[in-house]
Protein backbone atom coordinates (compact mmCIF):
# COMPACT_ATOMS: atom_id res chain seq x y z
CA UNK A 1 0.00 0.00 0.00
CA UNK A 2 2.88 2.33 0.80
CA UNK A 3 4.40 1.77 -2.67
CA UNK A 4 1.11 2.35 -4.44
CA UNK A 5 0.36 5.54 -2.57
CA UNK A 6 3.83 7.01 -3.05
CA UNK A 7 4.26 6.05 -6.70
CA UNK A 8 0.90 7.34 -7.86
CA UNK A 9 0.26 11.03 -7.32
CA UNK A 10 -3.40 10.54 -8.28
CA UNK A 11 -3.81 7.69 -5.78
CA UNK A 12 -4.98 5.28 -8.45
CA UNK A 13 -4.04 1.63 -8.26
CA UNK A 14 -1.14 0.74 -10.54
CA UNK A 15 -0.82 -2.92 -11.28
CA UNK A 16 2.32 -2.69 -13.38
CA UNK A 17 5.35 -0.64 -12.55
CA UNK A 18 5.81 2.13 -15.09
CA UNK A 19 9.17 1.95 -16.84
CA UNK A 20 10.59 3.82 -19.77
CA UNK A 21 11.16 1.85 -22.94
CA UNK A 22 14.86 1.09 -23.19
CA UNK A 23 16.69 -1.09 -25.68
CA UNK A 24 17.87 -4.34 -24.17
CA UNK A 25 21.33 -4.16 -25.74
CA UNK A 26 21.95 -0.65 -24.39
CA UNK A 27 25.29 -0.69 -22.56
CA UNK A 28 24.16 2.02 -20.12
CA UNK A 29 20.99 0.21 -19.10
CA UNK A 30 20.84 -0.69 -15.43
CA UNK A 31 20.26 -4.39 -14.81
CA UNK A 32 17.89 -3.89 -11.90
CA UNK A 33 14.85 -5.47 -13.45
CA UNK A 34 16.51 -7.84 -15.89
CA UNK A 35 18.74 -10.82 -15.36
CA UNK A 36 22.36 -9.86 -15.83
CA UNK A 37 23.95 -11.77 -18.73
CA UNK A 38 26.53 -14.37 -17.73
CA UNK A 39 29.37 -12.94 -19.80
CA UNK A 40 29.38 -9.21 -20.44
CA UNK A 41 31.59 -8.25 -23.35
CA UNK A 42 31.19 -4.55 -24.12
CA UNK A 43 32.84 -4.57 -27.56
CA UNK A 44 31.05 -7.53 -29.10
CA UNK A 45 29.90 -6.86 -32.62
CA UNK A 46 26.14 -7.24 -32.90
CA UNK A 47 25.25 -9.39 -35.91
CA UNK A 48 23.51 -7.32 -38.56
CA UNK A 49 21.75 -8.22 -41.77
CA UNK A 50 24.11 -8.07 -44.69
CA UNK A 51 23.25 -5.71 -47.49
CA UNK A 52 22.60 -8.00 -50.42
CA UNK A 53 23.07 -6.82 -54.01
CA UNK A 54 19.90 -6.04 -55.89
CA UNK A 55 19.92 -9.05 -58.20
CA UNK A 56 16.17 -9.51 -58.34
CA UNK A 57 14.25 -7.31 -60.78
CA UNK A 58 11.69 -5.00 -59.32
CA UNK A 59 8.06 -5.94 -59.69
CA UNK A 60 7.07 -2.48 -60.87
CA UNK A 61 7.82 -1.86 -64.55
CA UNK A 62 9.19 1.62 -64.98
CA UNK A 63 8.65 3.20 -68.38
CA UNK A 64 11.22 5.87 -69.28
CA UNK A 65 9.72 9.26 -69.94
CA UNK A 66 11.69 11.34 -72.42
CA UNK A 67 12.40 14.97 -71.73
CA UNK A 68 9.87 17.32 -73.37
CA UNK A 69 12.57 18.72 -75.65
CA UNK A 70 12.90 15.31 -77.30
CA UNK A 71 9.21 14.96 -78.04
CA UNK A 72 8.44 15.87 -81.65
CA UNK A 73 5.05 17.47 -82.10
CA UNK A 74 4.02 17.68 -85.77
CA UNK A 75 2.72 21.08 -86.89
CA UNK A 76 -0.97 21.45 -87.60
CA UNK A 77 -1.46 21.12 -91.34
CA UNK A 78 -4.66 22.25 -93.00
CA UNK A 79 -6.06 19.28 -94.81
CA UNK A 80 -9.06 19.20 -97.08
CA UNK A 81 -11.85 17.32 -95.50
CA UNK A 82 -12.37 14.18 -97.50
CA UNK A 83 -15.83 12.73 -97.46
CA UNK A 84 -15.67 9.30 -95.95
CA UNK A 85 -18.67 7.22 -96.95
CA UNK A 86 -20.49 5.73 -94.04
CA UNK A 87 -20.17 2.00 -93.98
CA UNK A 88 -22.71 0.05 -92.03
CA UNK A 89 -20.50 -2.11 -89.86
CA UNK A 90 -23.46 -3.96 -88.42
CA UNK A 91 -24.44 -6.48 -91.06
CA UNK A 92 -28.11 -7.22 -91.28
CA UNK A 93 -28.71 -10.86 -90.67
CA UNK A 94 -30.99 -12.31 -93.27
CA UNK A 95 -32.49 -15.66 -92.42
CA UNK A 96 -31.41 -18.40 -94.75
CA UNK A 97 -34.46 -20.02 -96.29
CA UNK A 98 -34.58 -23.68 -95.37
CA UNK A 99 -36.27 -25.75 -98.06
CA UNK A 100 -39.11 -27.66 -96.54
CA UNK A 101 -39.65 -31.00 -98.20
CA UNK A 102 -43.13 -31.29 -99.57
CA UNK A 103 -44.70 -34.65 -99.00
CA UNK A 104 -45.11 -36.57 -102.21
CA UNK A 105 -48.54 -37.99 -102.62
CA UNK A 106 -49.01 -41.32 -104.36
CA UNK A 107 -52.65 -42.14 -104.55
CA UNK A 108 -53.88 -45.63 -104.89
CA UNK A 109 -56.24 -46.22 -107.73
CA UNK A 110 -59.74 -46.16 -106.39
CA UNK A 111 -62.26 -47.74 -108.78
CA UNK A 112 -64.99 -45.14 -107.99
CA UNK A 113 -62.71 -42.10 -108.51
CA UNK A 114 -62.28 -40.45 -111.85
CA UNK A 115 -58.90 -40.26 -113.55
CA UNK A 116 -58.54 -36.48 -113.16
CA UNK A 117 -58.12 -36.68 -109.36
CA UNK A 118 -55.34 -39.29 -109.46
CA UNK A 119 -51.85 -37.81 -109.29
CA UNK A 120 -49.09 -40.12 -110.39
CA UNK A 121 -45.72 -39.26 -108.84
CA UNK A 122 -42.32 -40.82 -108.82
CA UNK A 123 -42.44 -44.46 -107.89
CA UNK A 124 -42.12 -44.98 -104.15
CA UNK A 125 -42.75 -47.88 -101.87
CA UNK A 126 -45.50 -46.24 -99.79
CA UNK A 127 -48.87 -44.97 -100.91
CA UNK A 128 -50.72 -42.22 -99.08
CA UNK A 129 -54.45 -41.64 -99.71
CA UNK A 130 -55.43 -37.99 -100.14
CA UNK A 131 -58.17 -36.82 -97.82
CA UNK A 132 -59.92 -33.50 -98.08
CA UNK A 133 -59.38 -31.20 -95.11
CA UNK A 134 -62.42 -30.77 -92.88
CA UNK A 135 -63.16 -27.18 -91.97
UniProtKB/Swiss-Prot annotation:
One record GO biological process: protein stabilization
Expression by tissue: Mammary gland specific. Secreted in milk.
Main localization (coarse): secreted
Residues of this chain annotated as glycosylated in UniProt: 96, 114, 131
Keyword Transferase appears in the UniProt entry: no
Localisation per UniProt entry: Secreted
One GO CC term on file: extracellular space
Keywords tagged on the record: Glycoprotein, Milk protein, Phosphoprotein, Secreted
Site note Cleavage, residues: 70-71
Sites of Phosphoserine modification: 114, 132
PANTHER family: KAPPA CASEIN, KAPPA-CASEIN
Protein family: Belongs to the kappa-casein family.
Summary of the function given for this chain in its UniProt record: Kappa-casein stabilizes micelle formation, preventing casein precipitation in milk.
Protein name (record): Kappa-casein
Organism per entry: Equus grevyi (Grevy's zebra)
Amino acid sequence: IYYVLNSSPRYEPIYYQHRLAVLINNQHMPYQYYARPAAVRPHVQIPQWQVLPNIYPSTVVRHPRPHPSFIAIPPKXLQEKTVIPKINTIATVEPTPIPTPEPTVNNAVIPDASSEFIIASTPETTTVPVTSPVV
